[in-house]
């Protein structure tokens, strides 16, 4: 007999954030590291393309704020999800582990949101 009131899982929400963070970390983050961390310091970037004024103007625009928010938050959720499942796989049982790892990710998301909004 099929249970008419099945227990709902919250895992798809966390897997969605994990997947989005993993894709962001694999596709967008390396490009940003290459541009800002390698090409810009050695002078292989054209002129004032990334001058302080232009970067500040981008960071203060709506698209820039969304980009900064996603650049911080998505890899954060991915990493904390991996840590949560790594602890489980290593048989290190953190009391209320779901609350610890996902709660920390949620708190840091709110802190990031406040920081990005107040730029």
Curated annotation (Swiss-Prot):
Pfam families: Fumarate_red_D (PF02313). The chain crosses the membrane at residues 26-46, 55-75, 99-119. It is found in: Cell inner membrane. GO terms for cellular component: fumarate reductase complex; plasma membrane. GO terms for biological process: fumarate metabolic process. Keywords: Cell inner membrane, Cell membrane, Membrane, Transmembrane, Transmembrane helix. Its main location: membrane. InterPro entries: Fumarate_red_D, SQR/QFR_C/D. One of its GO terms (molecular function) is succinate dehydrogenase activity. It is a multi-pass membrane protein. Belongs to the FrdD family. Part of an enzyme complex containing four subunits: a flavoprotein (FrdA), an iron-sulfur protein (FrdB), and two hydrophobic anchor proteins (FrdC and FrdD). This is Fumarate reductase subunit D. It comes from Escherichia coli O6:H1 (strain CFT073 / ATCC 700928 / UPEC). The gene is frdD.
């Amino acid at each position: 007999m099929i249970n008419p009131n099945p227990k709902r899982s919250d895992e798809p929400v966390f897997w969605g954030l994990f997947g989005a963070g993993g894709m962001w970390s694999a596709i967008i983050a390396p490009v940003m590291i290459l541009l800002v961390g390698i090409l810009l310091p050695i002078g292989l970037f054209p002129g004032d393309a990334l001058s302080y004024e232009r970067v500040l103007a981008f960071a203060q625009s709506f698209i820039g704020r969304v980009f900064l928010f996603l650049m911080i938050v998505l890899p954060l959720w991915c990493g904390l999800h991996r840590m949560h499942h790594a602890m489980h796989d290593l048989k290190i049982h953190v009391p209320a582990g779901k609350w610890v790892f996902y709660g920390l990710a949620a708190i840091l998301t709110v802190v990031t949101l406040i920081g990005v909004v107040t730029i």
